[in-house]
Amino acid sequence: MNGPGQAPRGLTVTIGGLPGTGTTTLCKLLQDRLSLPYTYAGALFREEAKARGLDLAAFGALSQKDPSIDERLDDRQVHMLRKGGLILEGRLSGWLAQRYKLPAVKVWVQCEEAERLRRIVDRDGGTLKEQADATWAREQSEADRYRRYYGVDLRDTSFYDLVLDSTHKLPAQLADEVVAAAQAWQHHAASHKGR
């Protein structure tokens, strides 16, 4: 039996969104609220870059040419999703759950571009122009890669269970919405168990 604030074994939540939308902040809140471990797919990318002795820019350029890098990282995410019982943050995590028909509450977070850039500057420093240029280049690189490797358009949010806009909401408000969706998902899963 699960106590208050404890998620049942197997509850999986995927959180995706572009840089600056607040996904990491949301995941940290959900980790406490749902008592689930949290994994950031970007950390897997960083681990792989470090293991190869490359900085993120060089590793990103390499991944543009070598699809096996994304395949390995995706395999790790799919393995985690199959095990369940976690929060997985990554731009493709919801899509991977959908593609492999893995049970998960799939959440996409969006935010107006000006607000995203303001948050990125607050977090990482630099000028608005520097961050806008770097963010645009990163997003274009990822969008091209996802389209080329998987046929994925990140603008297609039709398969997500919940699409949130963080532009004018506090992280706690977003967390409330995800917790409610997770509870509804759990109730639905429990009522269909054994059918």
Regions found by a protein language model. Name each.
Residues 1-10:
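Extreme N-terminal, non-catalytic leader segments
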Residues 15:
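Hydrophobic anchor at the beta1->P-loop junction of P-loop NTPases
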Residues 18:
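P-loop (Walker A) phosphate-binding loop of NTP-binding proteins
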Residues 22:
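Conserved glycine(s) of the Walker
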Residues 26:
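Hydrophobic positions on the alpha1 helix immediately C-terminal to the Walker A/P-loop
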Residues 32-39:
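Post-Walker A helix-loop "phosphate-sensing" segment adjacent to the P-loop in P-loop NTPases
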Residues 39-100, 113-114, 125-133, 142:
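ATP-dependent small-molecule kinase phosphotransfer cores
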Residues 67-68, 95, 128-177:
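Small-molecule kinase domains that catalyze NTP-dependent phosphoryl transfer to phosphate-bearing small molecules
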